[in-house]
């Protein structure tokens, strides 16, 4: 083992935060220094040259001050016996750089701790604070890291002696293995194996437990029900299916695959052909798939990997739909207990305690969103939608006074994608078909996730809890998805016959499911499974939940094609078996010469005992709202701080919202980029205005008063959120229903039944809406010992509805941004509560620690349908200036958020809403506020009346320029405050969370910027006509020069880049680095090269640096790139990850010696912003005739800060006029202030060019906003092409 010191690992503010945590834990630590240390396992000694190459390879990241380590060492490494994603990618890079004798690279974090002597207990406490026991180990000596490379002999299979010991043997195994088997399941297994005349193996029992867990089998939703002694006619699942039976319109696949599919649009899908690799549009049906999952249990144990693998698993579900599909846009949501932010505790937040084995709500909301965002970011899927609710209170509900809240959190992960018409249905698995595992190797992680998530937190052993959490490698999943993409793009020649993702239960669930669904059995070889931990037992190899894996059936004749695709994409795979005629599972183990599994499929997946739920209804006992202590002014401030209402920027800007170039409505609205969008919208392709939309609805606290009302409101809110897009008929909308319940808790089972019936049998059929997909999580309770007291925290019944719809025209989507530039205007409230104004279970009651008695509800189904249809007319006729639904916080919050988005004031009169101002302003009945032109008000009111809404419409007042927020009732002032003051209150929760998580200086700067009342918002100044197509004369000649669209494993922005060059008249060619390294392609035939954005090698060894070094340290490929850059007629562009990569190739690029490096953002966070830039005067041939132009652009990166050697280097860069783009603030001034400058680069620098102008590198993404509709905000006069299209046309013009 070789040990190589690395660079300092933590920035100054991270060290400060670590010292603060030590102080909070009463650990007397005076200083901490942390640096990376690398360990190389080599098969032969490295030569001096190879050693130098390895040293250079391991120099990466920002240049932080180094000092010799002093004090005691605590070395944090990956857990011995595991291989980290960092290790596999770093080893790949080393091999691609010619260091073939490196068997494996691994990285540790060496902490040098200074301070008074700590006792042994304190050292243990400090070690616990510095590492994640799930994934890491702590050593006190560098040599101890040798254990990382130790190899163990495989452990044998174990048998459970039921023939000798009978039932007791199974009962003991149930406890020891954490199987969560019910008594009747134990009886079933006893009968089955006794009938087979043999003892089961541990692997067979484990496989059965996972496949038949509540998590996988949904026993409660398929159970028979008796309520109050009355047999119920339907199961829960049958009531959900009733919606499809009533309205099957537009549904192509429901209830039988990894995701549901509905009809989409005929559009040009843009991808490279297999024959020549040239990108083009392919006119075909792009049907819409939809899926929403939860990952609650793992997120409670370890939030980052829990949320990351939640998103990763849901993405795999989408990709594994039909015979292979394309995930497109994602959503993430969280329900947690109270945050209790240190120094920002709120009056309604009481500490009720929690179990030690789960983390705090604050920890979940600090780490969980980062994990979910990081996976989506690295995979390359925009996260466009979400929700965030906190609830934790002692309330008087159905079961009397008890604790209700989300100690077991909800972590929601979902999204939509597209699929070809001929791939919607899975194919036939032929006898002899090869059974393949695509993706990463097996590791000893995530064991028992299905069974563990089916238990209430606190029932299982703490070690089993930790064992059941997986960890993530999104870059591997991206590689697998590229393989799936290449397969479905082959159309009828798609080699994939059948595909499933590997999730709960690992291969033990996925492979039996695959062959069973295909009507076959399977014969497998255990030792053919890719395995990074050879010491695992057969149970661990077969049942672990290592992520980023899919199982496929491939016809033998197509294996060569499949192998070729996988090799090009560097996606690992293994053929582990064959499909058999007999429906039998046989798993052979050639190492031990035995068969750990040998059982009929029907024992595993057959008719296990059906559950019966015999339950009792309980009546809600909510108390009437006590108003004595409620002041309206104080209520407003409290509600603005409540997370469900408060600004959620800290959850949004960490997530890429522009990748694909097909996002037309993200969370951020208008020139001031306020996060108040009601729904997410994507275009169906890069050549059309058809699209897809999705929205969320959930009102869980209402279930504490009325289960059915809560469910109805969730559906209603999803509809009011999506209503301001152009959908057409209501039945176009399809819903996902995610049900979370504490099954078995008094009253909850009957409440669940009532809620499902309300939606599945009544509301949705009446609206003609289908629920073709959903999921349930039935163990939403936490138990623990608090001193001498046994405590329970039970979540409210929680239904999260996600609405999906096909969109007729994405340009018609209306946002909450109030307009004061359209002449006189009118604000209308459409009150679907019809004056009920119920205050039970609202934000108001929550912030005053009450529940109330009567909640909101869907008051009139016909009016809800009429409302939707009326909005569709108004959207299609373009009569709406602004639209925002009423939800958490009520009418006052709706109006405030609209004013924030418009940076304006409102003056309204609520006299028509009754005499109870508190109820009028804070009820959360369904409804919306619309803004229309004053002269159209009468016509709009008539249209609403024609749709049955006459008694729901109230004229409120108008939006006005300025800072006023005035609410009156007749002549009485009800509430008056500055809009800017409300805006800051609304922002404070996000600010405090951001200060805790990121660089607090940046968080403070952002909060300070929100106080600038003179901020004009995003604005545009162009020095050219964006409607002029300067490439047109060259396109007319029909000569299409070739551009090499270069990608490395992990790159995710190549398709939209190709589309931009294609539109400018190029033939865009898909070139993978594996093509160049293998010699399949070279750069000689290209005049233009573009290196695309993403996460090459998952940013291991520095963003873009591993990619660059695989070029620099490969002599033939290095010469090829150098020759390209030295040809006087070539053009080269590097964007984001491609920019980072090319900046590290500067020694090969003439005139690039002054280029900087691009390193970790000053905020120490991934930054996704829509930022204003100005084109600087430079030689860049891409920016010709654009100098002086100011316009917004997509920014999405974690490492974009310009790093120069010193002041002289910066001066040389400036004096050479090589800066091509700079960040400016909304006043047009070059800035280093956050967030206008999202990465902290000196002088606002964000793009540089070579002396000749032929090579340009830039961190922002022009390719994601080359279409006007894909800009988060844009001036209304822009046409189809945004001004950024000029960059690509300049390139085409340059080539003549």
From Swiss-Prot:
Pathway: Purine metabolism; IMP biosynthesis via de novo pathway; 5-amino-1-(5-phospho-D-ribosyl)imidazole from N(2)-formyl-N(1)-(5-phospho-D-ribosyl)glycinamide: step 1/2. ATP binds at residues 306-317, 677, 887. It catalyses: N(2)-formyl-N(1)-(5-phospho-beta-D-ribosyl)glycinamide + L-glutamine + ATP + H2O = 2-formamido-N(1)-(5-O-phospho-beta-D-ribosyl)acetamidine + L-glutamate + ADP + phosphate + H(+). Mg(2+) binds at residues 678, 717, 721, 885. The keyword Magnesium applies. GO terms for cellular component: cytoplasm. Its EC number is 6.3.5.3. It holds the Pfam family AIRS_C. It is found in: Cytoplasm. Residues 1000-1013 have a biased composition (Basic and acidic residues). It comes from the Bacteria. Keywords: ATP-binding, Cytoplasm, Glutamine amidotransferase, Ligase, Magnesium, Metal-binding, Nucleotide-binding, Purine biosynthesis. Residues 304-323, 1000-1019 are annotated as: Disordered. Monomer. NCBIfam families: FGAM_synt, PRK05297.1. This is Phosphoribosylformylglycinamidine synthase. It comes from Yersinia pestis bv. Antiqua (strain Nepal516). The lineage of its organism: Bacteria, Pseudomonadati, Pseudomonadota, Gammaproteobacteria, Enterobacterales.
